[in-house]
C-alpha cells in the first residue's frame, strides 16, 4: 500500500464520493472542496461561491447570455473552485405540469433520463429531460420537463470554458419539492394532534427570481398547478397578481397559503397579504433559499 493511500484512509478521504458522482448530495461530494453555484435566467447569470467548509461566500450577477458571461468570467469562476466544479440551476426553458396515474415504481433519475417512456408512458417526448415529485396521498405528480438541447448547450459552454458541471437542476422545481416535503411533515403532525378536525386547503406559492409555480391542494389532493417562467420583475408584479387572482379567490375560511420564495419573498408576501387579508400565510422562505438548496442536496 502506498503512503498516499494510507493517508487517505486516515483522513477518511477514501470514503468521500467523487465530485462527479451525482448519486450523492453536493455537500458530501464537495467536503473540503470549493465549488461554484450558478442560476441561469433570461436576463443574466447569478452566482454564489461555496467555501471548503461548505459556507456560502461571495456572490454576483452579470447581465447577458450564458456564452458571453462564461467568456468574460471563466477565469474568475475557475479561481473560486477546486478543479472547476460548478452546479447550475436553470430558471428558463422548462415546464412544470400536473399529471395523473404515472407509475410509482422505485425508479432512479437515471432510468427517467435514459428511458422516460418506461415511467411516463405516452406522455414522454423525444428531446426532453424529466424529473418527478409524487403526491404520496393521491395519484397526482408534478412533472418537470426541460429541453435536452438546452441542457447539452449548457454542458458544451461549460466544457469550452474549462469548467466542470457536477449538477444541473431547476431552482423552482427544487423549491417546490422542498415545500411539498415540509407540508407533508406538517400534515402528519397535524393529524397526530387533531383526529377530528380536517386540514383545510393549501395554496403553495413558489417564487424564484421572477419565475413561479403555484400548486393548489384540497384534502391532500393536488388539484391545480400553474407554472410560469420569468413572469414578473420587481418593477412589474402585476402579471403575478393576475395569475394568482382566480386561485386566491377560491380560498375559503380555514385554508392557508404556503410561500417559499427567494430574495423577492417580501414583495410576494405583501402582494398575497393584500389579496387575501383573512387567509393565514405560512412563509417558509429563507435568505439565499436557492443557494442553500443547491449547496446541500
What are these regions (language model features)?
Residues 1-297:
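Hydrophobic/aromatic-enriched cytosolic interaction surfaces used to assemble or bind macromolecules
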Amino acid at each position: 500500500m502506498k503512503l498516499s493511500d494510507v493517508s487517505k484512509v486516515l483522513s477518511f478521504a477514501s470514503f468521500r464520493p467523487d465530485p462527479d458522482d451525482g448519486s450523492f448530495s453536493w455537500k458530501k461530494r464537495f467536503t473540503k472542496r470549493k465549488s461554484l453555484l450558478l442560476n441561469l435566467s433570461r436576463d443574466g447569470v447569478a452566482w454564489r461561491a461555496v467555501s471548503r467548509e461548505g459556507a456560502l461566500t461571495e456572490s454576483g450577477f452579470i447581465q447577458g447570455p450564458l456564452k458571453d458571461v462564461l467568456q468574460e468570467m471563466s477565469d474568475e469562476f475557475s479561481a473560486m473552485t477546486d478543479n472547476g466544479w460548478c452546479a447550475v440551476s436553470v430558471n428558463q426553458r422548462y415546464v412544470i405540469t400536473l399529471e395523473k396515474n404515472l407509475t410509482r415504481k422505485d425508479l432512479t433519475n437515471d432510468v427517467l433520463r435514459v428511458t422516460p417512456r418506461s415511467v411516463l408512458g405516452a406522455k414522454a417526448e423525444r428531446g426532453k429531460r424529466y424529473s418527478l415529485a409524487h403526491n404520496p396521498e393521491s395519484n397526482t405528480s408534478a412533472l418537470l420537463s426541460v429541453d435536452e438541447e438546452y441542457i447539452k448547450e449548457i454542458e458544451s459552454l461549460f466544457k469550452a470554458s474549462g469548467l466542470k458541471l457536477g449538477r444541473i437542476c431547476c431552482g423552482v422545481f427544487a423549491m417546490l419539492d422542498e415545500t411539498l416535503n415540509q407540508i407533508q411533515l406538517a400534515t402528519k403532525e397535524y393529524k397526530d394532534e387533531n383526529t377530528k378536525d380536517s386540514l383545510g386547503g393549501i395554496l403553495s406559492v413558489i417564487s424564484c427570481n421572477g419565475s413561479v409555480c403555484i400548486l393548489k391542494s384540497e384534502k391532500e389532493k393536488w388539484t391545480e398547478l400553474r407554472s410560469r417562467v420569468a413572469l414578473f420583475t420587481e418593477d412589474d408584479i402585476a402579471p403575478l397578481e393576475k395569475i394568482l387572482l382566480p386561485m386566491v379567490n377560491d380560498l375559503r375560511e380555514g385554508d392557508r397559503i404556503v410561500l417559499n420564495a427567494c430574495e423577492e419573498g417580501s414583495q410576494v408576501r405583501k402582494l398575497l397579504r393584500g389579496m387575501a387579508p383573512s387567509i393565514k400565510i405560512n412563509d417558509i422562505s429563507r435568505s439565499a433559499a436557492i443557494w442553500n438548496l443547491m449547496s446541500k442536496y
